[in-house]
A protein has these predicted regions:
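Active-site glycine/GP-rich loop and adjacent strand/helix microenvironment
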Residues: 1-14, 21-32, 155-369
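Active-site diphosphate/adenylate-binding microenvironment
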Residues: 17-21, 32, 36-88, 98-103, ...
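Short coil/loop linkers at secondary-structure junctions
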Residues: 49-51, 125, 217, 255-256
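Generic beta-strand structural signal
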Residues: 87, 128-133, 193-195
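Conserved catalytic-core segments centered on acid/base and nucleophilic motifs
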Residues: 89-92, 101, 207, 265
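Conserved adenylate-forming
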Residues: 92-147
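Short, amphipathic alpha-helical segments
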Residues: 105-109, 113, 126, 141-148, ...
Length: 369
């Protein structure tokens, strides 16, 4: 997959037009590989009447039948044996269903190259020894979720002195150890080293609320950072705006606004989307994003809400080149931060009862091309 290698060597990561041709070639290579190595995926594409010759430019990417993430939680699609993958993951399994995924060596190298470029651009790489608060559980043989691995993965961005996990395993059960967490952050503050807090926004809010309840106010090192991602999920009733959360944290921890970063990625689409200074998720050169009409699945124009379709050739381990989520979003231009590419504004979720099955919806959509 030489075109994929070339794409993931891109240095100007938010300048999309110069990469359009290599992106479409990489996607064609990706689809050809998966149809050869994943019979179930080939059957899906054949059933929808899709042919590689349909792809001639990035404007044709919408013709690729998008696979719903909900479908992948019920059906495993892999192009290489799961137990042979270099890195094996599952999705977080909200609702009790999980997606099996992972990286072979070539996919992992592409992911590493991409991550270093994106995270360096957003000034998240440092050589300073740093203490970490991970608002999650440490990955082990019993916990292979992409979320757990991603939280720990972010600790390589600055050399770790100490890592404190919020969730501990006690008698084979997960328990939140609030006292240890509070003691750790107070100790970290006294040490005078940078502190990085990583996790879900809901967990971060609960952490801040506990600090406030105990009357604890800190002024952490000026290079301390907060990296959040994953949304509020089952804690939607607790949701507050990002600006409220940032203000709450600044008051409690003394971390400046520019050191808060929101991050977006999924097990099925492992591309790094990191928020800009205006807190927007810009599309990097390693992916393309389409918003689709919820009823017809046809693409809508920028500025019009639609179901989020994420496209990337990063994985040769699984045929997840074009996946459709249950998120409703808008693709917008002209952020004002200086980044040229459009950005994703996620505004809500579609209930599963409102989404027809992959085969029914996609086949109807393709028949009308």
């Amino acid at each position: 997959m030489k075109h994929r290698r070339k794409l993931f060597l891109t240095k100007d990561i938010y300048n999309l037009p110069p990469t359009d041709q290599v992106f479409i070639k990489a996607m064609k290579d990706n689809i050809a590989f998966h149809t050869k190595n994943c019979p179930e995926y080939k059957e899906i594409l054949d059933g929808f009447g899709f042919k590689l010759c349909d792809l001639n430019s990035v404007e044709d990417l919408w013709k690729i039948p998008p696979t719903p993430t909900s479908y992948l939680k019920n059906k495993t699609l892999l192009s290489k044996p799961y137990d042979k993958l270099l890195i094996r993951t599952t999705s977080s399994g909200t609702g009790g269903k999980k997606t099996l995924s992972g990286y072979d060596k070539s996919s992992a190298l592409c992911a590493l190259s991409m991550a270093l470029k994106v995270l360096r651009f957003h000034k998240l790489i440092s050589l300073m020894r740093t203490n970490y608060i991970i608002l999650g559980v440490k990955p082990d043989k019993n916990n292979q979720t992409a979320t757990a691995k991603a939280l720990t993965y972010f600790t390589i961005l600055a050399p770790a002195k100490k890592i404190e996990y919020a969730v501990k395993i006690v008698n084979s059960e997960y328990q939140v150890d609030v006292d240890s967490l509070i003691k750790a952050v107070v100790k970290f503050g006294q040490e005078g080293r940078p502190v990085r807090i990583i996790g879900f926004p809901a967990y971060f809010k609960l952490f801040l609320t506990e600090l406030i309840a105990r009357g604890i106010k800190l002024n952490l090192h000026k290079n301390s950072k907060v990296l959040l991602g994953g949304g509020w999920k089952t804690f939607f009733a607790e949701e507050i705006s990002k600006e409220e959360l940032f203000a709450m944290a600044n008051e409690t921890l003394g971390i400046s606004r520019q050191n808060f970063k929101d991050h977006f990625s999924t097990a099925e689409h492992p591309v790094n989307y990191v928020a800009c200074e205006n807190n927007h998720f810009h599309v990097p050169a390693f992916s393309r994003v389409i918003l689709r009409d919820v009823n017809t699945l046809k693409p809508v124009e920028n500025g019009v809400p639609g179901v989020l379709n994420l496209i990337t050739p990063i994985l040769s381990s699984a045929p997840y080149g074009s996946i459709i989520t249950d998120d409703i979003a808008v693709l917008r231009d002209n952020c004002g931060c200086g980044i040229a590419s459009p950005y994703i504004d996620i505004i809500g979720r579609v209930g599963l009862s409102n989404i027809r099955t992959c085969t029914q919806q996609a086949s109807e959509f393709l028949k009308n091309l």
